[in-house]
Amino acid sequence: VGFKAGVKEYKLTYYTPTYETKDTDILAAFRVTPQPGVPPEEAGAAVAAESSTGTWTTVWTDGLTSLDRYKGRCYHIEPVAGEESQFIAYVAYPLDLFEEGSVTNMFTSIVGNVFGFKALRALRLEDLRIPVAYVKTFQGPPHGIQVERDKLNKYGRPLLGCTIKPKLGLSAKNYGRAVYECLRGGLDFTKDDENVNSQPFMRWRDRFLFCAEANYKSQAETGEIKGHYLNATAGTCEEMMKRAVFARELGVPIVMHDYLTGGFTANTSLAHYCRDNGLLLHIHRAMHAVIDRQKNHGIHFRVLAKALRMSGGDHIHSGTVVGKLEGERDITLGFVDLLRDDFVEKDRSRGIYFTQDWVSLPGVLPVASGGIHVWHMPALTEIFGDDSVLQFGGGTLGHPWGKPPGAVANRVALEACVQARNEGRDLAREGNEIIREASKWSPELAAACEVWKEIKFEFEAMDTL
């Protein structure tokens, strides 16, 4: 048979530097840190093997299949600048290894086992190229950016949101009141916090009812379409769907899900329901930093963002850039483009390892939230552009005069920035001046400017190239 038992080096089978990648291959870029003494080719080949057809020894059933057709291949290795013992291993996977329309299966294959592998000290999945043939097996976001704008009748500016705080402990009625005040003041959206599900102090059904009431009341008074992200995340998929169905029955425009803690299977089911029933879907990335914070181990957020676009969501939290370092800005804008655009060119300076063609998959709105306030508005408008959601939690609710004036301050600041931009002014250079001018006409904005003039969150960026 030519079958020879025993252990053989991975690189004999799985390191193929002459391989020409196919248009249908899923391509992965791994940052590999091998154990001392393990050569790069062997480590790269081990990653390819253990995440596809390989196992630690030769098995006779290998003879019953065509390894050449099904094996992952490490086809290129390059050193990481400034790192002694790290390199980028590029691996190509044949499309047949993956179930159609299943992000769950894709991740189980590519990152399921190999991250615990002893020959490696650390491993990080930096990027994935999803071939068009695989993209087409996914529904993707329930609606996408254009449909959302049409549903909301809001054009030519970023959308404004606010997370209701304190996130835990309010009764449903007080919570609904906070929602109403923010929406009434001029915000487009308010948001359940990611850990607001159905706790003893506020059961989900009560919250949904009071928030729907707040939604309708604020719409009637302002003449604008409003939304509150009702968090449907639950302990079981059935319970999650029950909440989504109830939201639809209330006639609200949008629900929400924590896609990493809830899981991709649950998320994809919910996304399908949302498209079929006209609900927008807001996605929170709770737990992402557990996976993406370490520079040498885990999965970079741009991969989790791509996976979400495949699984389905209309909004996703994507960091703020503001008040942090410049290096982070390019990387963040890299995955923001991957969320929004149809076609994204390879650009290593922005952390994009592969050209990605999304064909006709709808786009996702990036959500900037976390530690931002009115002084950040010019920078946020300039960095994220119109197709984004800017979310101010404390930056709305912390206003010295209360929530409605806090909402007014944010809306005035945003409208001023958009108008200044449309008049050709430079938001990056004149931002503070633009806000100051606007605050002369808005006492609410002036009060907000006074409160937050000194607040900064200055730390070194973790996410550098």
UniProtKB/Swiss-Prot annotation:
The modification N6,N6,N6-trimethyllysine is found at residue 4. It catalyses: 2 (2R)-3-phosphoglycerate + 2 H(+) = D-ribulose 1,5-bisphosphate + CO2 + H2O; D-ribulose 1,5-bisphosphate + O2 = 2-phosphoglycolate + (2R)-3-phosphoglycerate + 2 H(+). Its main location: plastid. GO terms for biological process: photorespiration; reductive pentose-phosphate cycle. CDD domains: RuBisCO_large_I. It is found in: Plastid, Chloroplast. InterPro entries: RuBisCO, RuBisCo_large_chain_AS, RuBisCO_lsu_C, RuBisCO_lsu_C_sf, RuBisCO_lsu_fd_N, RuBisCO_lsu_N_sf, RuBisCO_lsuI. SUPFAM superfamilies: RuBisCo, C-terminal domain, RuBisCO, large subunit, small (N-terminal) domain. The record marks 324 as: Transition state stabilizer. The active site is at 165 (proton acceptor), 284 (proton acceptor). Its EC number is 4.1.1.39. It is an enzyme of class 4 (lyase). Its cofactor is Mg(2+). Keywords: Calvin cycle, Carbon dioxide fixation, Chloroplast, Disulfide bond, Lyase, Magnesium, Metal-binding, Methylation, Monooxygenase, Oxidoreductase, Photorespiration, Photosynthesis, Plastid. Mg(2+) binds at residues 191, 193-194. It comes from the Eukaryota. One of its GO terms (molecular function) is magnesium ion binding. One of its GO terms (cellular component) is chloroplast. Substrate binds at residues 113, 163, 167, 285, 317, 369. Binds 1 Mg(2+) ion per subunit. Heterohexadecamer of 8 large chains and 8 small chains; disulfide-linked. The disulfide link is formed within the large subunit homodimers. Belongs to the RuBisCO large chain family. Type I subfamily. The basic functional RuBisCO is composed of a large chain homodimer in a 'head-to-tail' conformation. In form I RuBisCO this homodimer is arranged in a barrel-like tetramer with the small subunits forming a tetrameric 'cap' on each end of the 'barrel'. This is Ribulose bisphosphate carboxylase large chain.
